[in-house]
Amino acid sequence: LENNNWWRLITPIFIHFSLSHLAFNALWIFVLGSKIEMLDGRFLFISLVIFTGIASNYIQHLWNGVSLFGGLSGVVYGLFGYCYLIELDLKQERYGLPPAIYIFMLVWLILGFLGILELFGFGSIANHAHLGGLISGLIFGMLTKLYSKKNI
């Protein structure tokens, strides 16, 4: 990042461009975050937010270069990726998310990349941050599983 402005990797999660943008992200952080924090601990939740926030913003920056973007959507996708991976081989739901929610988020991601959301007035969307968040959440989930198995 230009001139060693490393903080730009995390500060976009504090910027939102509309009240609905903030409300949508806050809702998912509350719903998913409270479940992850309760079941997996506060330290893991905070680490997950920081990891997915930095990763999603870095991917967005790599893909689009210097541009103005913000929001917690990359982190939200990271939380979904984490929950999905942790639940993948469990016999029962851990976080209580119905499969339709995961499908909805994937469809939303695809619609974003296709430009359909912008056509319907959702504004410019940091699609690569969403994808980066999803991938980094999956990675965090894999690392969490590996670490948990080694320490049992």
Feature locations, PLM:
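A detector for small-residue-rich transmembrane helices and their helix-helix packing motifs
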Residues: 1-152
